């Protein structure tokens, strides 16, 4: 009944969408800072704006940014919907720091992303739930409280979106995202499957895959992974502060799970483990108290932020959206939207899920309905770590068995550039029919942020666009950049270098200006001192000639300059071989192509 009701609403919205045309959402790239310095051939066709979910023009609406595919030989006619998590965090994180066509430099200008996923399909970044990013909740200001409501909104959005972009309806639909999107994506996939069941074949959405990166899928089981994960990194033991308390919390969580499903969304006994761990594992002694970064265990942050000041590019994104004219170019009214906020706590606090189950319960049914799942995980993440994701997969039932079966294929994943002369260890892959797990080496909670070009290989693995090889007793799965990828990477690195040089010159000019001003100030002070010294010496004669000595006045101006830096302390971690547009090198893992044997 609910799906039929939504269908009727969607049909009404589709009719209303006739009033909206693609031209209403066209983004003139040259209005975005930095794009004029990029080769036009490298700039994708873009559309953006607010897609209404109601016929009321001031009603609920979701903001989207569409980047058309530029994929050459690897085009597979896919629409990849990307969602960030939170809940309440903007998918512009994904658009400008992860899988989109651009990254943002320190001055707020765009440069090419060498690992953009739009070289594999059309990317659609959506701010949701309502109230997130530039999306609006409507006249009444109501925010969503249940995942099922979010799924309803997503269906309405897609109905309206496809009416405006009918060519995308013919594409295969891939739902992708990270973190709390591990809740969104299965719910949205389930809504699509139920919708399709009531539609004629030609009217069905072509949902094929769900790709969850460092996903929050099973809150209870994943909470049990924190202690063993940090222990495996040598950060937790008997000497740890609150050691016994944390072990008691771990035991209480396990016992609660053993006694059956939670009455709410998750067991309260499991929710306190990570916060207590973060407060108990300090960083090296510093003037300020530090803790591990919950999104990248290699990093440190100021307590109690513990990762909330991360990633490093975040201030650049704020600067981009704060540049005059940017919001107008994206068809957003700055007077209505206000400044961009990455994550809105009000949205997170509203989504209590009093009547929703964790998405893990939907996955077996989706697999039976023919939906494939790819779980990819950066191996340096704490909050949604590898152990927790593998634990939840082990509890999933599909094709009559629990977890990965004896038929599971295991691969060492290597990534190669186009000439295939050297390979870089990228991760490990487990594949069992419709379920794939990928552990990505040297990557954080945001895999594409750390290893952009390697992250693009995840899509190739999902499509089986890979090479198989053997090295010793190990089976190898190899992803290879296309010629178009190499061209994009070369142009991206050149574009990035231009931005770097411009910033360097700008900073140099600023420094010279500062030195000149400082020098002029010092000269002025010296001049004033000399002047008053001479005045003290010759003052009587001057006053006698020019003024009445009894009416003279004096003044003194205090001069001070405070150049103290008060930025966030992030610890001593150095990325080493990491560089935007390149790889993290894994020591002693380069392999010559001569060592490969095809199978």
Curated annotation (Swiss-Prot):
It is a single-pass type I membrane protein. It comes from Eremothecium gossypii (strain ATCC 10895 / CBS 109.51 / FGSC 9923 / NRRL Y-1056) (Yeast). It is an enzyme of class 3 (hydrolase). PANTHER family: PHEROMONE-PROCESSING CARBOXYPEPTIDASE KEX1 (PTHR11802:SF190), SERINE PROTEASE FAMILY S10 SERINE CARBOXYPEPTIDASE (PTHR11802). Residues 1-19 form the signal peptide. The active site is at 179, 381, 445. Coiled coil: none annotated. It comes from the Eukaryota. The chain crosses the membrane at residues 513-533. The keyword Hydrolase applies. This is Pheromone-processing carboxypeptidase KEX1.
């Amino acid at each position: 009944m609910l799906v039929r009701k939504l269908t009727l609403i969607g049909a009404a919205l589709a009719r209303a969408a006739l009033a909206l045309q693609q031209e209403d959402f066209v983004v003139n790239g040259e209005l975005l800072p930095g794009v004029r310095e990029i080769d036009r051939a490298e700039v994708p066709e873009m559309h953006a704006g607010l897609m209404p979910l109601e016929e009321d023009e001031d009603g609920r609406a979701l903001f989207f940014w569409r980047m058309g595919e530029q994929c050459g030989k690897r085009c597979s006619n896919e629409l990849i919907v990307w969602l960030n998590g939170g809940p309440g965090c903007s998918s512009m994180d994904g658009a400008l720091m992860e899988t989109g066509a651009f990254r943002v430099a320190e001055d707020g200008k765009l440069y090419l992303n060498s690992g953009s996923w739009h070289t594999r399909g059309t990317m659609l970044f959506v701010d949701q739930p309502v109230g997130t990013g530039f999306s609006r909740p409507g006249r009444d200001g109501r925010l969503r409280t249940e995942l099922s409501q979010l799924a309803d909104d997503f269906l309405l959005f897609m109905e309206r979106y496809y009416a405006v972009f009918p060519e995308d309806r013919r594409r295969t639909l891939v739902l992708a995202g990270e973190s709390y999107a591990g809740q969104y994506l299965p719910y949205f996939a389930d809504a699509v499957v139920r919708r399709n069941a009531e539609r004629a074949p030609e009217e069905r959405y072509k949902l094929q895959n769900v790709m969850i990166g460092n996903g929050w899928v099973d809150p209870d089981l994943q909470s049990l992974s924190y202690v063993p994960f940090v222990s495996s990194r040598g950060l937790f033991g008997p000497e740890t502060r609150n050691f016994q308390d944390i072990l008691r919390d771990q035991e209480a969580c396990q016992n609660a799970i053993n006694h059956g499903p939670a009455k709410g969304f998750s067991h309260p006994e499991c929710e306190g483990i990570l916060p207590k761990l973060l407060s108990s594992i300090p960083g090296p002694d510093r003037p300020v108290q530090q803790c591990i970064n919950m999104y990248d265990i290699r990093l440190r942050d100021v307590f109690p932020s513990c990762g909330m000041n991360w990633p490093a590019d975040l201030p650049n994104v704020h600067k981009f959206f704060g540049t005059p004219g940017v919001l107008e170019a994206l068809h957003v009214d700055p007077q209505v939207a206000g400044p961009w906020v990455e994550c809105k706590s009000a949205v997170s606090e509203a989504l209590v899920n009093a009547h929703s189950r964790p998405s893990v319960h939907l996955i077996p049914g989706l697999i039976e309905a023919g939906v494939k799942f790819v779980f990819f995980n950066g191996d340096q993440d704490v909050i949604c770590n590898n152990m927790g994701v593998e634990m939840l997969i082990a509890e999933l039932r599909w094709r009559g068995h629990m977890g990965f079966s004896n038929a599971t294929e295991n691969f060492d994943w290597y990534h190669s550039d186009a000439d295939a002369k050297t390979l870089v260890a990228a991760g490990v892959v487990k594949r069992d029919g419709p379920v794939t797990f990928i552990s990505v080496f040297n990557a954080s909670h945001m895999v594409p942020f750390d290893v952009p070009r390697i992250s693009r290989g995840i899509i190739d693995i999902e499509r089986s666009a890979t090479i198989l090889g053997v090295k010793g007793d190990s089976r190898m799965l190899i992803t290879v950049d296309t010629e178009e990828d190499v061209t994009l990477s070369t142009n991206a690195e050149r574009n990035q270098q231009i931005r770097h040089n411009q910033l360097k010159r700008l900073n140099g000019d600023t420094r010279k200006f500062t030195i000149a001003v400082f020098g002029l100030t010092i000269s002025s002070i010296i001049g004033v001192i000399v002047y008053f010294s001479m005045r003290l010496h010759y003052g009587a004669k001057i006053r006698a000639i020019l003024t009445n000595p009894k009416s003279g006045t004096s003044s003194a101006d205090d001069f001070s300059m405070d150049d103290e830096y008060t930025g966030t302390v992030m610890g001593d971690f150095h990325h080493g071989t990491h560089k935007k547009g390149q790889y993290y090198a894994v020591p002693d893992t380069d392999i010559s192509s001569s060592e490969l044997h095809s199978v």
